[in-house]
């Protein structure tokens, strides 16, 4: 109970940030990571700038991330005795971690940071310690209760010269009910456009009707997620189902998706969740 009060208290300054934004600050449509979600905001006649982000778009990013964290917290604090609610909590956590690391990859790619050593030099142990152009100072308070840690898997990156591997982990002091949950994403260098343009293929999806209903309910509750392919939804749901199973031994669970382009340099992204205590 003390932990819950601590989290709620930490979100008090965030509410001021949220209410400070007005409808006219929002641009028409902003897609951060199309592979994961598409957010539709209030209508405006002003188009988004082509080359650089506007002040409104930066504010929108802050709002979206803040809302996603808060909604994940609410989902996990209202689990009760219903196993389906626990899966919903797990799915919210999986989506949040996946969204954060994909957005980080896109920013790194846009800045031309592709070499493992450069990644290693830039990545800080705690997510909130990243440079301000990666984690805005205004929303650092949002991430403090999550106790997020970052890392670069140099061994994996070294074995596959055309790939980088980043790790995002929930620390032991996280407010979420998954301390030690880690996510590793390995991705083809220079292929972030593959992640943002629905060009990934070879992802299997096989949710039954009941599971599909639970997944749809969770995605509808999380405002950041407007659109996601059925196959991605299936994979993320199956990961959440696994990590919330009390018999899970912590071994890796995940999937690999390939770009649609043919040839030896075909891009791919591999996602795995595991327990790292």
UniProtKB/Swiss-Prot annotation:
Q: Name one GO cellular component term.
A: membrane
Residue stretches spanning the membrane: 1-21, 85-105
Keyword terms: Glycoprotein, Membrane, Transmembrane, Transmembrane helix
Bilayer topology reads: Multi-pass membrane protein
Main localization of the protein described in the UniProt heading: membrane
Protein's name in the database:
Uncharacterized membrane protein YPR027C
Chain positions carrying an annotated carbohydrate: 155, 265
Q: Which residues lie on this side of the membrane: Extracellular?
A: 106-277
Compartment annotation: Membrane
Question: Which ranges does the record list as Cytoplasmic topological domains?
Answer: 22-84
Residues annotated as coiled-coil are: none
Superkingdom of origin = Eukaryota
